[in-house]
Amino acid sequence: MRVLGVDPGLTRCGVGVVEGVAGRPLTMRGVGVVRTPADAELGLRLVAIEQGIEQWLDEYRPECVAVERVFSQHNVRTVMGTAQASAVAMLCAARRGIPVALHTPSEVKAAVTGSGRADKAQVGAMVTRLLRLDAPPKPADAADALALAICHIWRAPAQNRLQQAVALHASKGRTA
């Protein structure tokens, strides 16, 4: 499975592509950041993020896009920008018929480090180790995007089995 991880942000939108299957060594195919100037008009920033993500989709042809689920932050302005960048990533994938998976920051941290309360340095160190890299990807947004892709590759098989079981249960006329 090839997954594009997206760590949404208006100024720095981390992107990373990981390929592999659960239980096997994973391979990083690409990592980077789509940047926009903080002083640019919002609409232009969103268009720049769209163009950047479209380039990644064209180049790497992922089977799925994993996006960090936006959660409540103390700074409303920050959460709005994150949500807007997240929506752009989801729109780009949906337009192409690529499935989108949302993962919370604590889900990603737990999947990659074993602790949902891990800090950025711990996530970066584990991404480096899991992907057999020489150094942690910089900035942290890039490492977070790879962590999202890793999380999805590892969690997708269990999520798919659960969805199939629920569908089978529903098809037999049972309710939850």
Swiss-Prot record:
Localization per Swiss-Prot or TrEMBL: Cytoplasm
**One cellular-component annotation, GO:** cytoplasm
Annotated EC: 3.1.21.10
Principal place where this protein is found? cytoplasm
- Residues the record lists as binding Mg(2+) 1: 7, 141
Q: Which domain of life is it from?
A: Bacteria
**The entry's keywords:** Cytoplasm, DNA damage, DNA recombination, DNA repair, DNA-binding, Endonuclease, Hydrolase, Magnesium, Metal-binding, Nuclease
Q: Which residues bind Mg(2+) 2?
A: 68
**Where does the record place the catalytic residues?**
7, 68, 141
**NCBIfam families reported for this sequence:** PRK00039.2-1 (NF000711), ruvC (TIGR00228)
Q: What is this protein called?
A: Crossover junction endodeoxyribonuclease RuvC
Species of the source: Streptomyces avermitilis (strain ATCC 31267 / DSM 46492 / JCM 5070 / NBRC 14893 / NCIMB 12804 / NRRL 8165 / MA-4680)
